[in-house]
């Protein structure tokens, strides 16, 4: 039974501590939309999305109103489009037509973002997957809310270096195609290793082929709540600190579980998972960086940052997993530089560098996220960054990702502004020493020895 103190506590978390449900995401399978012609595929996709998701936004708003819980985004994920369009798409331009169909359908139902313009190439690329990847600069520059991801590796299969090398050039081309908007197209693209099938967050969300016809996944967010709770832990030992984070994560996740079950009931679509992630925003007091600083760092990036983040990530999972019947997605603490006020400040004064961020990705929820880098960064350097991050994920059996923005026409110290939840970021330096001879070797990096578990 709920008591009145718990009700007041939850209300305080929402009103004063910026607790929100970051997203209700509906996953929709498009496997049955495949057809002989691209136009027919586009029509099938449009019809299925607008049928299944027609009430998603209104239901989200009704739940907000009925329970008083802010739901920031309503989103859709779909089956990786490289699979759906494989039989009908004969060129990159054909895939771009599907991107436009996704954009139109998502706008019709009123969602904020749609993810799944994706390819899974952890071992090698099919012709269709390569065409989709080559279509990304045009697709992401011509659409508004379509998000894309490419899974380039996994612990079981290794890393496909052919796709990694290609993606360095593609990221540069996306940046060029959207140069008039601080290369915003790169915000909508992420390269993954060990990508999950049920991620409700963007830009990496897609509806995996292991999923059913439709599902509701929910991502929660509460770094501000954790930050306020840590005020009570000042000067206390690690046991008290960990217990405080765990208890707070439990409360945050219960809110997400309530919203997920209610959305599932009202929409008549099965509940999938809760993603336990702490997802920051650029607003003051809604920062993962602030949480790390309250744990005891002068500023994010100081020695000890990786250890503090490892502890935070683990306690969030331990607390949250007891609050939901199904946990999945990425689940942990996000470190997106442009979306986190304290990380923006740390990057601005040189305390937080890309090398430290890479170390932090060994223990955080995902990887190098929302990092603005100089526009003259080479394609090979970007491929090298993706390869490094994929290797961390492959060897450590975790999800890792890269979402870097080489801001065309800007250099170190200048500011890139992406707007809204995406925030803003100082452009930070990247080691420009060449790795071209490495990333252009061709072939794939084999899976690690500990992947052989049969």
UniProtKB/Swiss-Prot annotation:
| Gene3D superfamilies per record | 3.20.70.20
Superkingdom assignment: Bacteria
Q: Which InterPro entries match?
A: UPF0210
Residue pairs linked by disulfide bridges in the UniProt entry: none
Signal peptide as annotated in the record:
none
**What is stated as this protein's family in its record?**
Belongs to the UPF0210 family.
Matching NCBIfam families = PRK05313.1 (NF003700)
Q: Which HAMAP family match?
A: UPF0210
**PANTHER family referenced in this protein's UniProt entry, alphabetically:** UPF0210 PROTEIN MJ1665, UPF0210 PROTEIN SPR0218
Q: How does it assemble?
A: Homodimer.
Return the protein name: UPF0210 protein BAD_1323
Q: What is the scientific name of the source organism?
A: Bifidobacterium adolescentis (strain ATCC 15703 / DSM 20083 / NCTC 11814 / E194a)
């Amino acid at each position: 039974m709920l008591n009145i103190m718990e009700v007041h506590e939850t209300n305080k978390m929402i009103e004063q501590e910026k607790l929100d449900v970051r997203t209700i995401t509906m996953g929709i399978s498009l496997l049955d939309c495949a057809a002989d012609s691209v136009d027919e595929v586009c029509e099938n996709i449009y019809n299925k999305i607008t049928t299944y998701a027609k009430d998603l936004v209104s239901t989200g708003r009704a739940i907000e109103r009925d329970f008083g819980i802010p739901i920031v985004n309503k989103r859709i994920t779909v089956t990786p489009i490289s699979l759906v369009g494989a039989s009908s798409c004969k060129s990159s331009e054909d895939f771009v037509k599907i991107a436009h169909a996704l954009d139109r359908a998502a706008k019709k139902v009123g969602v904020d973002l749609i993810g799944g313009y994706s390819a899974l190439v952890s071992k090698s690329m099919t012709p269709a997957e390569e065409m989709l990847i080559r279509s990304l600069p045009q697709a992401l520059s011509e659409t508004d809310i379509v998000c894309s991801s490419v899974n380039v590796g996994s612990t079981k299969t290794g890393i496909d270096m052919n796709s990694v090398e290609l993606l360095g050039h593609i990221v540069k081309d996306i940046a060029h195609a959207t140069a008039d908007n601080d290369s915003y197209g790169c915000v909508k693209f992420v390269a993954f290793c060990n990508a999950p099938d049920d991620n409700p967050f963007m830009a990496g969300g897609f509806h995996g082929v292991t999923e059913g016809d439709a599902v509701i996944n929910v991502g929660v967010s509460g770094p501000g709540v954790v930050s306020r709770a840590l005020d009570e832990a000042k000067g206390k030992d690690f046991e008290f600190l960990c217990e405080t984070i765990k208890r707070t994560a439990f409360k945050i996740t219960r809110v997400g579980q309530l919203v997920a079950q209610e959305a599932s009931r009202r929409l008549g679509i099965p509940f999938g998972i809760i993603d336990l992630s702490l997802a920051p925003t650029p607003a003051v007091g809604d920062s993962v960086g602030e949480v790390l600083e309250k744990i005891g760092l002068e500023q994010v990036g100081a020695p000890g940052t990786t250890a503090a983040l490892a502890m935070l990530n683990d306690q969030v999972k331990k607390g949250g997993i007891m609050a939901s019947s199904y946990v999945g997605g990425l689940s942990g603490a996000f470190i997106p530089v442009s979306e986190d006020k304290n990380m923006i400040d740390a990057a601005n004064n040189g305390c937080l560098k890309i090398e430290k961020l890479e170390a932090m990705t060994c223990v955080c929820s995902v990887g190098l996220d929302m990092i603005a880098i100089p526009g003259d960064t080479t394609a090979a350097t970007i491929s090298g960054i993706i390869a490094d991050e994929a290797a961390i994920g492959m060897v450590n059996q975790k999800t890792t990702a890269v979402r870097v923005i080489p801001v065309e026409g800007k250099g170190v110290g200048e500011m890139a502004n992406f707007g809204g939840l995406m925030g803003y970021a100082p452009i930070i330096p990247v080691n420009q020493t060449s790795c071209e001879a490495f990333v252009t070797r061709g072939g794939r990096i084999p899976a690690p020895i500990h992947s052989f578990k049969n």
